[in-house]
Amino acid sequence: DVIDLKDKPFIAGTMEGYFAMRMHVLVRFGKWQEIIDSPMPERPDLYCLTTSMHHYAKTIAFAALKQFDKADQEKEAFYASLKCISPNRKLFNNPALQILGVGEKMLLGELEYHKGNYDIAFAHLRESVRRCDDLHYSEPWPWMHPPRHALGALLLEQGHYEEAEEVYRADLGLNDTVPRCGQHKNNVWALHGIVECLKERNGEMEFNKLQGLLAEALSKTDLTITSSCCCRKTVSQSST
């Protein structure tokens, strides 16, 4: 009812944006079948951001399962859904289309990665990181799944340890490349990634420190984390 308030479009748009964030959670935890089984909104005109987020998530889910025909169909549906979103539509202080631009590059990156087109995939994911960094700060975050977590995980899987380490350092705020508001200090996903990198290059002193932070973070989780992103297929037990 709140979303359908004709006389309060700002409230309607904000609440609809919150509703759309459920897809971020399912992608974050790799709930591919649950994403695929999620029904599309019955009123895409009203739930326009949610509709786009469903297509984004379904593209990533089908790509992870290597069902590429369906992933490509969802990708095209994602682009079609963007046409239903007004350029003036905002989620707090960011245009909705700018926020979804982050997702566009994430879905393209993960789709191309699972197809085996790694260079193209990494180019898309790096652009997703750049676009995410360009978003205005707000709480909650305008884009909930940090693109660096996907980029780092997939770089690691292909043996690009040096770049992956820099990606995680930026995300964790261990260097000065990202403003504080864009950092995710002591984030369990990013800690898992950088510990993997340090293990590969035998950075013993820093490895021991960050592995301790990772162990502490993992003690507070209720699931097993084996990568900074569920989009990666190979797993690592970096806490051991």
Put a short name on every predicted segment.
Residues 2-12, 38-49, 79-87, 91-97, ...:
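Solenoid-like repeat scaffolds
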Residues 14, 21, 50, 93-100, ...:
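Structural signature of alpha-solenoid helical repeat junctions
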Residues 21, 53, 57, 100-103, ...:
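"A position-specific structural signal for the A-helix of alpha-solenoid helical repeats
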Residues 26, 62, 112, 155, ...:
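Residue at a conserved register position within TPR or TPR-like alpha-solenoid repeats
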Residues 166, 170-240:
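C-terminal non-catalytic interaction modules
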